[in-house]
Amino acid sequence: MENTTKPLPPWADKIPEGAFISYETTYKVGEYFSLFKKEHFDSIERPMDYYFYDPTEHGFSKDKAYPLFIFLHGATNALEGDVCINYAGAEFYASEEYQNDFGGAYLLVPLANEYYDEEKNLKGFWDESYTEPLFNLINNFIQTKTNGVSKKVVFGNSSGATMSFKMVTAYTDFFDALIPIGSNNIPEDKILDEYDKNDVHLFFAFGKHDEFHSYEEEILPRIPRLEKMKHCFIFTPDWVYNGDGGIASINFGKEMGQHCLINSMHTNLKLDDGTILDSRLPNGVTGWLRDFLGK
């Protein structure tokens, strides 16, 4: 049911007839936090903390290489403690269901060195200065925490999605796929050409009623170019839903329910009753990943 004590979203008058606004996610946060470990990457240039999940500690063989899924969180999320694992869209990938979908995968959640200054301005969030240090962290993780990895996939939420583009643009021959969620920073054509030359797979996700960026002005003009890529799946839903089937509203001083497409992506593009949110993906995001990985 609608919670009438909540502020009405700016898009409330545009929702389809018969639809309702949902003010809460329906999944449990923290159920899989215990499966992650936290470590510190001690680097002279930029030390960072990170969370990780090791499939070989949870029933998968130690005698093979597994894919590495890297999750880049959105702005302020590094300040949320373990909850950042969920906000980055990584938590459910540690579940038995998701891990079995692609035969095991390492999960890595790097943390930007975020903080608030005396004027309450957020500092230390993802930007280009993190590109090389983050690449070094990833390589260090592979060398010290794994027995080798196969394909490398970068997920990103919001500002983390923009950072995922920056990482793959800087190291195109290193990464195999990226899944940016909620970023308007689609690279220019010559960069997308490099993605194609290196067989990089792109899953581009952006809600048409995103409160932070205009789909019509910033995304739609770039869709034809994305469609020309060798490996690009485009997911731009009319509405972002919570698990109860309601149109999602999140407001912590500013409405962002439609920007937080990460929640639908994290729950594998399915509602609680099993309804599939995109008929092209009957097995959700994990099904797309399984196909990409050749499983």
Where does each model-flagged region fall?
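A domain-start/cap signature at the N-terminus of enzymes
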Residues: 1-67, 157, 162, 222, ...
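Gly/Ser-rich "nucleophile elbow"/oxyanion-hole loop immediately N-terminal to the catalytic nucleophile
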Residues: 59-64, 118-158
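Active-site machinery of serine-nucleophile hydrolases
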Residues: 68, 74-132
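Alpha-helical scaffolding within the catalytic cores
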Residues: 86-98, 162, 184-194
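Short, proline-enriched alpha-helix->beta-strand connector loops that line the catalytic pocket
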Residues: 103, 196-202
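Short glycine-enriched nucleophile-adjacent loop
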Residues: 161-172
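A conserved short beta-strand
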Residues: 173-185
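C-terminal catalytic histidine-bearing segment of alpha/beta-hydrolase fold enzymes
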Residues: 203-205, 209-217, 227-295
